[in-house]
Amino acid sequence: MKNIYVVLSSTPTMMGKIIRVFTRSFYNHSSISLTENLNEMYSFARYRASNPLVGGFVKEFPERFTLGKQEDVCIKVFSIPVTEEQYETIKLFIYKMKQDREENIYNSLAALGVLLGYKFDTYKAYTCSDFVVRTLIEGNVLWDACLSKNIIPDEIHMLLEKYATYSGFLNAYKPITGVNYDAEDFFEKSGAVNEVAYTLYHFYRLIKRNIVYSFYIASKLSQINKIFTV
């Protein structure tokens, strides 16, 4: 048997605080790790500290949670026992995401949908919680119905409560000692003009995918109707 680790966090960022207020939740971010020391922890989040709206598949590290500030973060860790086959399936799913990181982007529309009570399904676009739950579904830990609506970290908490192994501050989580990471890209500043351009392009990609996906679904429904009306 092996273990997969899910980490929920209550980050001190402005975006994190807004999400917690609107969702009335304690946690605002979800991550998944292949190792207990969180050396292989992944999620969908911002690419750079300076822009919370543009993101995608990322490998996470402690300083991402606080944007480099000297603050601690409340986390909850769930240690989920899985078979060797489940572990490899989950690992392969994550690594495929990593290889296709240019196409897999953060679903900022879905994040807004959580706040507005509307679900945006977008091709190859995920929120942090979408990604964690989809990964667990791939490994047959959770079931498809878990994604029938917008899912938030506190709902993941309810689904995985029996696997909880740690609740407290990130800095006090002992297994994290000695983890190596490169934070240079995350804290790189590209300037206000570039950030605006990145944001506009990011939302253009999301909206375009939503329009294309809507036409695709409409086409499929039309084909099904023709079959049943013949």
Where are these regions (language model features)?
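Cysteine-nucleophile amide-bond enzymes
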Residues: 1-230
